[in-house]
Amino acid sequence: MLGYQRSSWAGNPANPYDTTRAASLGSSSGSGVSVSANLVMCSLGEETRASTRGPANHNAVALILPHKSLLGFNGGAIGADIYCDRAGILARTIDDAAKVLDALRDPDRAYYDPRDPYTTVPRSSVLSTPYATHTGMSGASGSLAGMRIGVIRESMVIRPVEKATVPICTSAAAVIKAKGMDPFLR
């Protein structure tokens, strides 16, 4: 079950591009709406299941959803499930979201948070360089040469009426390959 958007202060949030539509069912829909409507540059949300992915998708904003061992979450945030909850960074561009992620890095401890047991895992999955430096890559052919990305179709829940989404995944993999990256499909 997803979180629901609700506000006793000003009513429920609506999609800023079409106010007759919901901003999504994610509990961080206000975060997505505020970024999409240019009220703020970025917003932090909490995700248990799809509370930041839904608002990012429905409001056309970028999202960085770090894994639990990258960004500490046990510093006072209220979540529904300690095993699933994590922070999401919503912004107008992926570059802005990466800059926020870099700003959340502690100068002494990096991304380690002594209050969060998940950040004590091996740090091999954390870049030593700022994340924002990796968002400025050119879109020219071959710019992604040597990189690999996985398109895992088994995890995509596609109902029979949504078979039209299958060609989208295949064409996205073709675009990735044209940029020089090695997509592997499963």
Show the residue positions of the predicted features.
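Alpha-helical scaffold elements within enzyme catalytic domains, especially in hydrolases
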Residues: A174-V175
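Conserved dinucleotide-binding and phosphotransfer motif residues
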Residues: K179
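A short helix-breaking turn/cap at a secondary-structure junction
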Residues: L65-P167, S171
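Short glycine/serine-rich loop/turn segments
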Residues: M1-A87, R115-T120, I152-S155
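General small-molecule cofactor/ligand-binding pocket signal
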Residues: D182-R186
